[in-house]
Amino acid sequence: GVVEMFHEKQRRGEIPKDLDITFVMVSGDGGMDIGMGPVIGTALRNHNMIIFEYDNGGYMNTGYQLSYTTPHLAESKTSIVGPAFAGKSTFQKGTGTSTFHKDTPMIMAGTNIPYIATVAESHPLDFVKKAAKAQYVSKHEGLAYIKAISACPLNWKSPPEEQRSVIGTAVDSCYFPLFEIYHGITTLTYDPNKSNNKIPVASWFKRMGITKHLLEDDYKEEMDSIQKEVDRRWERLKARSEHPLL
C-alpha cells in the first residue's frame, strides 16, 4: 500500500518526480508464515520493492515457538525433546509425523518474480552484490525477494561470538545454500564442494543446543532422514543451475 501511495502521489505532483526511494519490507520467518497470503499477492502484482526475510528458525520475540523454518526435530517451547519426543511439532519418536523446513525461496520462485536470492553474513561480499542487484530490480523490473539466515544466540543456545561461524556452517552443510534466481535462471553463488568445504548437517547441528540431541545414537535414523532431505534439495538446486529450462 505504501508503495502504490507513493507512486500515486508522484503522479498527482504531491511528491517530487525525482524523489528516489527504495522500498524494503523487512520480515522474519514468523512474518513470512503469518503473512504468506499478502506476500504472495505482492509477488503476483510484482510491486516495485524488496522483501527481505531474516530467518532465525523460530518465533523468537515471543520466547521461541517453532516456525515452519525451524530445523526438523529441533527443540523449541512448542516442540518437546525427551524420551518420547524428538522435537518439532510434538513429534513422537518413531512415528515420523513432523515436517522439514519450509523452502520459502522456492515458493517465491513459483510466483515468477524477477529476482530471488539467499544471503548469509558469513559471505558478506555475496550479500552486498545481491542487495545491489535487488535494488536495481526493485526500481526497474518489479519485486525482489532476499532471504538471509539470521542467528539467535539466546534461543539457538550457542555463544554470541560464534554466530558468524555458526551461520557459515549452515551454508557449508548446504542446509542453507547460497544462490539467486533471475528471470527464472538459477545460479549457485557458492558451492562448498568446489572449495572442499562441504560438511554434513550434523556439523551444523552440533553447534546449537536446540539440535544437539539429534547427534545421539537414539536419533541416528532421524538424523539420516534430515541429511537425505538436505542432500535431495541440494541436488535439485544444482540441477536447476545446470539446466536453464528447470
Place the predicted regions along the sequence by residue.
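Thiamine diphosphate
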Residues: 1-65, 123-134
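Short, conserved beta-strand edge motifs with alternating hydrophobic and charged residues
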Residues: 53, 118-119, 145-149
